[in-house]
Amino acid sequence: MTENKGKVVSVNGNLVSVEFTGNVSMNEICFVNVDSTPLKSEVIRIKGNIAQVQVYEMTGGIKCGDTVDFTGEMLSAELGPGLLGQVYDGLQNPLAALAEKAGWFLERGNYADGLSGDKKWLFTPTAQVGAVLRAGEYVGTVPEGAFLHKIFVPFYLTGTFTLKSIVEKGEYTIKEEIAVLTDERGRDIPISMSFKWPVKRAIRCYSERLAPEATMETKVRLVDSFFPVAKGGTYCTPGPFGAGKTVLQHTTSKYADVDIVIIAACGERAGEVVETLTEFPELIDPKTGRSLMERTIIICNTSSMPVASREASVYTSVTLAEYYRQMGLHVLLLADSTSRWAQALREMSGRLEEIPGEEAFPAYLESYIAAFYERAGYVLLPDGSKGSVTIGGTVSPAGGNFEEPVTQATLKVVGAFHGLSRERSDARKYPAIDPLISWSKYKSVISRGKMEYCKAILHGGSDVNAMMKVVGEEGTTLSDYILYLKSEMLDAVYLQQNSFDLIDANCGTLRQRYVTDKLIKVLGSEYGLVLKDDARAFFNRMRQRFIDWNYTEFESQDFKDKERDIDDLYKEGEGRLTVDAERLLKDGE
């Protein structure tokens, strides 16, 4: 730590101006001393010998003349074994440790190490003495839950290094020296199991960045089939309050085809964060049968916490995600909600007296949001393995208005858009993703032709529904009315899904493809129906049989029996495949 000091010259909310001597750098961490209590802060602007710092705590009691200690370090996350299962605040203070230290009502100025320095880990060396290593290559492994946690050459080292010595297999703390590297100048560099990395710098210790192609299966039919997300891709879920964002997030984190889940609750209401903290330890991971928390990290900053630390929580979470990606793991980062982070940027921009953009958000809002989502990616690592960080950000636009700046800036950089609809959530159609406005640039688990065919039915049915609101059911032709019934059936049996049923919530790729083919056969047929009442009765019966089918185990005897019931009803309705549907089913297109 440097001896660089300064003194407070003005205070404006959580923005404090500090006069300093010596050298101070942007994003440097400093501590403002208030009645012998150090408050963690970050330098966000420098003018001459005045540094403007944002304080990560409540600033009551700060006065002109208070001393400030500059550390010479950036805001950093501690990386090493012991991160999984932790609940942190935005500055990587473990909340459980803070509660033990200070009780339930935290006083400002309390900080704790991100990783326990006392716990011992079983280290197994994998690199041989004399090996030539670079930053991002590993020297050994440590078991952490269900994963082998790799111990890396620290990412901040540059150049090549020779492994001079390494400890034998045994139990060590994260602070103990486990190896010594020799650099190109012959200097010895001791390394331990943990090191720090600045959260605002992306970790780039990979060989190549690849295009995200493999689909990240969420087991949510509407997402995987119609608006898929790729591993290493990005997506956003904007929607009004109460539209089902949190339940969709829980379902995704539980069933998604990823190794690690990181939840950044930045600026959400305290009630929602408490709900997440109480429910996640009780959620059972279907892969292991154990608690989902064993492969989860939660970073929480509620809306009642200081505004500045919301920004830190977003960067801390993505840094932890990149760290586990470096091990060849697939990580899903769920940021809830990026709107609150943007509001924190707006507040600081106002205090800095910058020229405001639309709705008083800073003019650089788009570049900040883009820089965050660009840290997602699918990468090839030095050892030949592949890892990914997939970022899913929820946006909470006021009144569900998707035209506001945060949503629009997000839409420009993400690869998939899952727009939640108040109308669908009020009608209890969950997940409430609106299929008419959502989109994705990634590859679906079903063929493109089948996906477009189903979307055409949905759009056609929506048009007929809009017309019926004006002219009534009597004013529509039988063919239009049947199209409307088909779209309603597709919505009810495929787009809607019960997140609380173990079978229906977990709908894998094979089942989605099988059910899609059966649906196209039913929806792509013409029937011997002459009255609208007959058509309504027929499709209501068909819909109920499909819904019952959804609740049966795939390829079980019950599944086959329910499928036989569907086929019998199809024959009863005198179904005849159209040319387009027949071609789709034959070609797989």
Where are these regions (language model features)?
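P-loop NTPase nucleotide-binding/switch module
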Residues: 100-156, 163, 173-233, 248-251, ...
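N-terminal accessory targeting/assembly segments
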Residues: 1-107
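Metallocofactor- and cofactor-centric catalytic cores in central/energy metabolism, strongly enriched
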Residues: 39, 48-51, 73, 135, ...
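Short, surface-exposed secondary-structure edge patches
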Residues: 19-24, 56-61, 76, 84, ...
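P-loop NTPase catalytic core
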Residues: 224-228, 232-545, 555
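Short, surface-exposed secondary-structure boundary micro-motifs
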Residues: 21, 35, 73-74, 92, ...
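C-terminal amphipathic alpha-helical interaction region
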Residues: 531-589
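Short beta-strand-centered aromatic/proline hotspots
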Residues: 6-8, 39-45, 150-153, 159-166
